[in-house]
Amino acid sequence: MTPGEIRRLYFIIKTFLSYGLDELIPRMRLTLPLRIWRRGLFWMPNRHKDLELGTRLRLALQELGPVWIKFGQMLSTRRDLFPPVIADQLALLQDRVAPFDGKLAKQQIEKAMGDRPVEEWFDDFDITPLASASIAQVHTARLKENGKEVVIKVIRPDILPVIKADMKLIYRLARWVPRLLPDGRRLRPMEVVREYEKTLLDELDLLREAANAIQLRRNFENSPMLYVPEVYSDYCSPTMMVMERIYGIPVNDVAALEANGTDMKLLAERGVQVFFTQVFRDSFFHGDMHPGNIFVSHDHPHDPQYIGIDCGIVGSLNKEDKRYLAENFIAFFNRDYRRVAELHVDSGWVPPDTNVEEFESAIRTVCEPIFEKPLAEISFGHVLLNLFNTARRFNMEVQPQLVLLQKTLLYIEGVGRQLYPQLDLWKTAKPFLESWIKDQVGFPALVRSFKEKAPFWAEKIPEIPELVYNSLRQGKQLQQSVDKIAHELQEHRVKQGQSRYLFGIGATLMLSSTLLFINRPDWGMSPGWLMAGGILVWLIGWRRTD
């Protein structure tokens, strides 16, 4: 480790100890020498004994900075790793940090634009940031070419070395988790850290975010449900993104929405519809739909429209995942736990040798109490959470796309019920899911599949006669090759049999000559001729083995 890494590691451990986070490690895992070393080296008692453990963990991560804040946010979605009291506190982590100097942001923009002055491309550039987060901050301006209002998102300068340094330390700490926690191996800490690192590095590439926003905008073009601001891709680079500036009401500002006359019931239901449309129709969903990234248009409040920003994190499901997920939801709400268990096995989410009866019983034990509540109060997100937590006991592999979907669904549910507490998610989603499943099977699906593959078959049908001829010719050639190999094998067997026969004769002659030479020396040269004959026959047999 470098001196800088040692200093940073010391600060991290010191921060954890000052918040009493060594309580997370069972005492039996801390040997006496380790406890003495911990006291002697740091001499750092818990200074926040009056706070709950989850609160102390949240405050410690906030003190450690942006990389750790985002790590905590990601861990809050993995409720299989922590009890609810800790996961709920981690969910409160806010990705808000002090802005960096606007002059540095201006330099970043000029560097991204080929070292040309900002004034050459933008008017009214505001050096004071509109918003600031751990990875980037946003400035406002107008495009010089058309006068449109835009926001310019700029990556923080020198953020990459900070991220790499902290990630190295997080990896080091993750390697210790299996040694310190009884359940450490099941938690797969290295896998969790790798997943986080990929997400974090993806957020550093604003070209990727721009492409995601363009895709999402295309998917909801002319839709009354969701508006995605236009991205000006000619001005984008890995460290800078320029997009249309929008004006809307923050989705969690319920008072402002009501004052604007917004139809709150329709708005809440549309949030659910937007989510399921992204997942099942488009196979491409916004993976960071927390309230800070969602606004509501001021226009037509009786036909409200969402505005979505910050597409740095997106998810997608393949066709099989979508079908199994939809059928899982429907089977669960029909209380068909056997079907839920079978779907987990069929999808490959759990090993194929899983005992379906035991799995069904475990799902029923965990999920049946949920139905004690009215259907309108049941949380889709917690349904998924309970299913996944149960499945992990049966060695379900971590499915990153499903973890991200579950996190997003929890956001959507939270926002929806904040807007309209009586929101019945199942009533809103069930027709959509049933319609989607019906569309995937039967005659309509067959017709659609034929249409999708028609160009392929139109190209291949003229080639069929030639393919048939080539197949027949290759079949004939293959049969000839097989016959030839069989004939050669038969010849080889015959030769081997003859060789063994000749070896036997040669050995007999040589043995006989030896006995005659010993017992009848008066026979003269006869034993010698027998020996020579035996050697000759043996050599002929040896030659036939080649």
From Swiss-Prot:
Its EC number is 2.7.-.-. It is an enzyme of class 2 (transferase). One of its GO terms (cellular component) is plasma membrane. GO terms for biological process: regulation of ubiquinone biosynthetic process; ubiquinone biosynthetic process. CDD domains: UbiB. It is found in: Cell inner membrane. Residues 124-502 form the Protein kinase domain. ATP binds at residues 130-138, 153. The chain crosses the membrane at residues 501-518, 523-542. Keywords: ATP-binding, Cell inner membrane, Cell membrane, Kinase, Membrane, Nucleotide-binding, Transferase, Transmembrane, Transmembrane helix, Ubiquinone biosynthesis. InterPro entries: ABC1_dom (IPR004147), Kinase-like_dom_sf (IPR011009), UbiB (IPR010232), UbiB_bact (IPR045308), UbiB_kinase (IPR050154). The keyword Manganese does not apply. It is a multi-pass membrane protein. It holds the Pfam family ABC1. The active site is at residue 288. It comes from the Bacteria. Signal peptide: none annotated. Pathway: Cofactor biosynthesis; ubiquinone biosynthesis [regulation]. One of its GO terms (molecular function) is protein kinase activity. PANTHER family: CHAPERONE-ACTIVITY OF BC1 COMPLEX CABC1 -RELATED, PROTEIN ACTIVITY OF BC1 COMPLEX KINASE 7, CHLOROPLASTIC. Is probably a protein kinase regulator of UbiI activity which is involved in aerobic coenzyme Q (ubiquinone) biosynthesis. Belongs to the ABC1 family. UbiB subfamily. NCBIfam families: PRK04750.1, UbiB. This is Probable protein kinase UbiB.
